[in-house]
Curated annotation (Swiss-Prot):
Alphabetized GO MF terms: arginine-tRNA ligase activity; ATP binding; glycine-tRNA ligase activity
Phylogenetic lineage: Bacteria, Bacillati, Cyanobacteriota, Cyanophyceae, Nostocales
NCBIfam families registered for this protein in UniProt: glyS
UniProt keyword terms in alphabetical order: Aminoacyl-tRNA synthetase, ATP-binding, Cytoplasm, Ligase, Nucleotide-binding, Protein biosynthesis
UniProt-listed GO biological process terms: arginyl-tRNA aminoacylation; glycyl-tRNA aminoacylation
Species per Swiss-Prot/TrEMBL record: Nostoc sp. (strain PCC 7120 / SAG 25.82 / UTEX 2576)
Catalytic reaction annotation: tRNA(Gly) + glycine + ATP = glycyl-tRNA(Gly) + AMP + diphosphate
Cross-referenced HAMAP family: Gly_tRNA_synth_beta
Name assigned to this protein: Glycine--tRNA ligase beta subunit
Pfam families hit by this protein: DALR_1, tRNA_synt_2f
Localisation: Cytoplasm
Amino acid sequence: MPGFLLEVGTEELPASFLGGAIAQWRSRIPQSLAANSLTSESVEVYGTPRRLAVLITGLPSQQPDREEEIKGPPAQAAFKDGQPTPAAVGFAKKQGVELEALEVRPTDKGEFVFIQKKTPGRPVADILTELVPQWIYSLEGKRLMRWGDGDVRFSRPIRWLVALLDEAILPLELVNGSLTVKSDRISYGHRVLHPAPITIQKAGDYVNTLRDGYVTVNAKERTTTIKEQVAATVQKLGGYTEIYPDLLEEVTNLVEWPSPVVGKFEEEFLNLPTEVTTTVMVSHQRYFPVFKTGDHKELLPYFITVSNGDPTKSEVIAVGNERVIRARLADGQFFYKTDLSKSLESYLPQLETVTFQEDLGSLRGKVERIVKVAAQISSQLQLGEGDRQNNQRAALLCKADLVTQMVFEFPELQGIMGQKYAVASGESPEVSTAIVEHYLPRGADDILPQTLTGQVVGLADRLDTLVSIFGLGLIPTGSSDPFALRRAANAVVNITWAANLQINLASLLAQTVAEFAAQYNKDQAPLITALNEFFLQRIRTLLQEEKQIDYDLVNAVLGENDPEYTERALQDLLDVRDRALYLQQIRRDGTLDKIYETVNRSTRLAAQGDLDTQQLDPTSVVRPELFQKPSESDFYDALVKLVPQTQAAQESRNYQLLVAGLVEIAPTVSNFFDGADSVLVIDPDPEIKRNRLNILGLLRNHARVLADFGAIVKNL
C-alpha cells in the first residue's frame, strides 16, 4: 500500500507557529482523509524551523467504489400508462443511466423512482493533489505574512515542496501571483551542517534521509535529545536544572540538530534575586539555569543554551551568548539598585499615570477599589483588627511594583519584585507575601495563595476586574475571553473552596457593582444578573470537571431555573460544594438509591400543590382529622420526627443527619403510596387532596435542604 510524503520547506518558522501547525495537521489530515474515504495505517506529522512535513503510510491506491441509492420523482409523475414521461427521462439523463435502470419502490409518502448508482473510486494521487493545497493554506497562526506577490498568506515564505507517492513525484504547484513552487524530491538539510540539496528517493526514507543531513524532523525526538543533553551537561557542572515545559517546547521548535553549549557569567550577578536571573535566562534568552545541588534554589554562575549551529564552534557560540546575558544582568542589577532607593509605598503616586483599562481609569483607581473590596471581605469573614490591617495594607501596595524599573523591563516579575521591595521597605511578612500571592493562581496548574491576606487580596483584585470589565459590556463569548475573565472567576471559586472562606459572593458582587455603578453611572440590575449567571456557570463547570460530580447532581444543587438554589449557591460557595460532593458520595455507596424513589415521587406529585418550599413543620399545614388511612398518620408522625434532624442538618451543614432521616422514613412513604393502606393522593375531595399534597410537599421540602431531587436521574 502506498506511502505519501509532503514536506513544505520554508524560511525560519516562529517556534510558536510550528507547534500549533503540527497540532493542526495531526488533527485535520486524518479527518480530511476519512472525509474522502481514504484509510491509512499511520499519519506522522513532523516539523522543524525550516519545514513542516507529514508522512502517511498504508494508503489505498484508490478510493473504494461507492454505491448509493438516489431517489427520483414520484412514480405517477415518472410513468404514464407504463411509459416514461419527460420527468423520468430527465432524471435518468441527469444521473447518467439508462431508463431500464429506473426502479419503482414504495415509501411512506407513496411510490417513487429510484436508481442504484455505482461511482468508481478515484485514484489516491488525484485526491491528494486536491487535498494538499487545502492542508497547507488552512493552517492558522498569528501574523501570517504574504510571500511572493500574490494574496496567499503563510507564516513564512515557502521555498520548496516535496511530494512523493512512494517513489513517484506527485505533481503539485503552489501558485502565488507570479511565483510558483513546484513539487519535487529535493529537500535541504541543516543550513550550516549540510547546506547542499538532499534527494529523497522514497517517501518512507524521509526521516533517515534528513537525519543524514543533520536534521531531526521528529519534534518528540528532538525534545528527548535536548533533555538528555542538558541533564548530562549540568551533571558535569556539579549542579542541576529545571526543565521548564514552555522553554523546552520553544527550544525544540528553534533547532533542527540540537547541541548543548555551556556559558558563564560573573559571580557578582548572583547577588541579584534568583527570580531576576532565571527570568533573564529562561524567558528572554532561552537558557537553562544551573542550580547548586541541594534543597534551596541557589544559582551557579553557568547557563546552558541549546545551539542549532556547528557543535565544533561551541566556544564561539558561548562567548556570544555570554556577552548578551552579561548586558542583560547588568541592566537588572541597575534596575534593582535603583528601585531599592525608594520605599514601595512611594511608587503609589506613579500608578496614576498607568491606565488600567480604557474607560476604567488608572491603576491607582483600581487599587483604591481593591482596598474597598478587601475591607468588605474582611468584614464578612469577621476578622480581627490585625488581619484587617494586613489586608488593607497589602491591597494598597499590591500593584505598586508595576511602575518600578525592574517590572517595567521584566513584566513576568510582577508581584515577585513587589514582595522583595516590600520586605526591603520594612513591611510585615504577611503583607509582603500577599503581594506575590494575590496573583496566584497564574495559570490552570498553578498553586493557590496559602496565606489569608494573599487570599483576601487575590479575591478582591479579581472581583474588581470582573465587575469593571463586565461593566464595560466586555463579557466573554464562546471561545473569546481576551481579559481571562473565566480564569479570574474560576480562581475566586477555587480560592474560596481551598481556603474554606465563608464569604457571601452574591453580597460581594452586589456591593462591588453598586460602587462601580455609582462611579461610572451604570445600571446595576443587568450587571448583577450577568455576573451571577457567569459565576453560576463557572461553579457548574468546576464541580463537573474538577470535582468530578455527575451533571445531574450539579443540577440538583444549583437548581435549574430555580432562584432559591441559585441564590443559595452564590451566597455560600462552601455549602454548594459540600452538598454536591455528598450527593456524589451517597450515589457511589448506594444510599441515594434507598431514598430516590420515595423522595422523587413525592417531589413530582407535590408540584401539583401550593405548599411553600420553606415549610418543614407539618403541625401547621397538615390536618390529622382528615386522615382516612393509618399510612397517613404514620407519614405525619415520621415527618414530625424528621423536623429536628433536618433543622440540625441545616445549622451544622451535616447533611448525613438529613439523609439518615430520609432513609428511615422511606418505608413509611412507600407504604403510603403502595402498601396495604395506600391512598389516592389526588382524592376527589379537594380538602383531602390538599392535605395529602401538603404531606408530600413537606417531604420534598426536607429533601430540598440537600438538593432538588427532581433534577436527579435515577440510572445515570
